[in-house]
């Protein structure tokens, strides 16, 4: 510490490794934003995502869909996981693609800046894989679920009906009229949804392009640690 007269600074450390783990600090935020399983709460949330929402003239409508399970006249897709967006519980492919890409790109540019203190689920304990790659993989797994294949691609989970109250994700009680299922919106180039809850997405190429570039970078960087997934 530094002492000047009667004034003392807090204790601080002088070391060649003082900045170790600084790059990993951002991952604390990413882990607490996780959907499906939250390592901070040690509990799961939104495990029933979700039922598909799309217009009748969208590519891959009822007559061509092959990936969903139909229960009680609902077209269901397994879309759990990923990250909650901002301070609500909506999820977007385009922002998740960007987040995952930047995690991967940061590791590619400076892999020695990242450490390994957490496992793939975000729980404490090293697993032999840099935490930044674990976090990126969490996002990549969700993005993979959002693109079952062909012309069938999804870009959003939930909508502004989410904005009712502050609550923990494990205590989310917002009802979209389908029990525990939340709506999953298709990429169509047109806004999807109901009345004032209709989303504003008109992108197709931008979402697909970000998806392709993120997946390509993920495949490149995960070849060593997870070749089967890559």
Features from the language model and the residues they span:
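Aromatic- and Gly/Pro-rich amphipathic surface segment
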Residues: 45-79
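Extended acidic/polar, glycine-enriched regions
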Residues: 1-28
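Well-ordered alpha-helical scaffold segments within catalytic/enzyme domains
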Residues: 4, 89, 100-122, 139-149, ...
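Extended ligand-binding clefts on enzyme/binding-domain cores
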Residues: 26, 33-47, 53, 131, ...
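Asp/Glu-centered strand-loop micro-motifs enriched in Gly/Pro and often flanked by an aromatic residue
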Residues: 1-2, 69-92
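Active-site lining segments of carbohydrate-active enzymes
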Residues: 82, 86, 154-230
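Acidic, glycine-anchored loop motifs typical of Ca2+
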Residues: 121-132
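Aromatic- and histidine-enriched alpha-helix N-cap/loop-to-helix transition segments
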Residues: 56, 62, 71, 90-101, ...
